[in-house]
Amino acid sequence: MPAITLLSEADLRSCITLDRDAIDAIEQAFALLATAKVAMPPILRLDVPEHNGEVDVKTAYLPGLERFAIKVSPGFFDNPKLGLPSLNGMMMLLSARTGLLDALLLDNGYLTAVRTAAAGAVAARWLSRQDSRSVALIGSGEQARLQLQALRLVRPIEQVKVWGRDAQRTAALCDDLGRDGQLQVKACDSVDQAMQAVDIAITCTPSREPLIQPHHLQPGLHITAMGSDAEHKNEIAPTALARLDRYVADRLSQTRVLGELHHALRAGAVSQQAVHSELGQIIAGLHPGRVQAEEVTLCDLTGTGAQDTA
């Protein structure tokens, strides 16, 4: 049996960062989803309702790669009350030739955080206006910070508005984001205030009730919705999704049962026969992305095993 490589979060942080290379790798993974025979089973989820927790298992095999990943990703959303992070996890890296375990990545959720933020940047690169300079962050956790970091690698962001349910946490995030003086950062008292006159909105919360409503949809707006990765989560009102000029999924087979599209279909706001695009199809040139500056677009990101393997 070959030796198994064991890497800690510190090891991984020293060699993998949220940069343009990471964004390009995730972009390639999306393109492969649209053009190659990717093997990606549905997400396995275990709910632990008495502790406000869930565990997701994701995997995918991308043709041509020597290895594939299986990720175990717990999310226990009462953990901050205990002084613990909401998210953690690990990945197993297996040989695509033999199936033997090559490496165990004890990333504590770091790799998931990086690839999730990188996916948001890919969505913005293909669907937001190139001259987008302002963003609303709906959510004030670590993923909101990383989403902004990734977004700034693909768009010339100057103004940031932040809304979160925890006002103290939101204020602390805003202080941190504005510390170097490169950004104009404002903590907002409401989603309405945060959504006023912005080019991009990023929702990254575990909300079970819609936060984005039809009156928030301004011409030219792009929304990246990150939070609805389970049936009970919902950040975008079905009536708002129905008013979009362009809805894009990371994987339609997932967003029809887990994402924002799931809620719109269930509410009857969107037809079951409506034709939608996947992000990989746009990257591969199979479907159009943003066509006109005034379009309102949304990318529904539920997270894919292809991103983890990439």
Which residues does each PLM region occupy?
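Short helix-loop-beta connector
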Residues: 127-134, 156, 218-219
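N-terminal Rossmann-fold NAD(P) dinucleotide-binding loop
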Residues: 144-145
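N-terminal ligand-binding/catalytic initiation module
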Residues: 1-113, 119-121, 128-131, 277
